[in-house]
Amino acid sequence: MLRLSCLLLSSMFAVSGAHAAPALPPAGMTAVLARWDQTEHPDLRAVVVMQQGRVVGERYYNGATRDELHDVRSAGKSVTALLVGIARDQGRLKIDQPVQRYWKQATGSAIGPVALRDVLSMRSGLAADDENPDSPGNEDRMDEADDPKSFVLKVPRAAPPGTVYRYNSLTSYVAGVVVTEAVGKPMDVFARQYLFAPLGIERWQWARDASGITKGQGNLSLRARDFAILGEMVRNDGVYQGKRIVSAAWLRDALTPHVAIGDSDPYAEGYGYYWYAKTHDIKGTPVPVRFASGNGGNKIYVVPSRQMVVAITSSAYGKGYGQRRSEAILKAVLAATP
């Protein structure tokens, strides 16, 4: 675990001082991305590749267009983590504080005394497991509730906080509630002001639930290019076109693998604060990658050693091949670039 964390962090924050890797000529990248023009499953939407801060590859599939807003599903969790960081940078919250400090209604519930840090790393200890439909805090149960916010407060504890990783959308929903309470405005409004507008992202949609709460667990719709811009800001240590969006210190913490998950996730080795980590072998060279991931194969891959971002939108919701295909696209792009 420590070796993985150090490898990822050293690559992420040392790249800016290294010589820039030469980008693959646009024609070469076009040829790489064209491999997916005709596939068995017609639900790939877009791939955008940025290197050294510029778009070097962009392709749309199966009728998708540049202006299409696409639901990136749980990749929205990673955006929630960015918003937690921005609120932290502004002094609005601290992640070592319990949820109930900001969400007063949570006092007396199982989630109330849990530190936000454990919420962000899926170690809340609540009986919430999206892989188990019988779990009291399963995502489907929460989504079907008349009042999801009240539903969360009734989910019991299953383990001490900070001890067990269980992937679930309930805790990222809680993170969204905490941001809302800490900043005094809906999270999507906060996102517009401090994340999307500074990045020049003008067209987007973020769903709210039956309680009127922005869904911190996902259901954020973006254009593929804007999806990539989020990744480019992360790759550049929180800066985009000279503007500081979120602190480098926060990104170090959020992208550090705090939990080893390789035994339960075939596409990742570590989990930070709603961001994943994996090192790929590309032609015998280890290439550390961290990424946002959503159902269907929606990804923002950030590759510091290549100064690269690969954003993929896909509507293969609920289909295992969507994740496999996105990883295959990433590997093909990496294999074709220096």
Language-model-derived ranges and their functions:
Residues 35-64, 301-303, 307-311:
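A short, well-structured edge-of-sheet supersecondary motif
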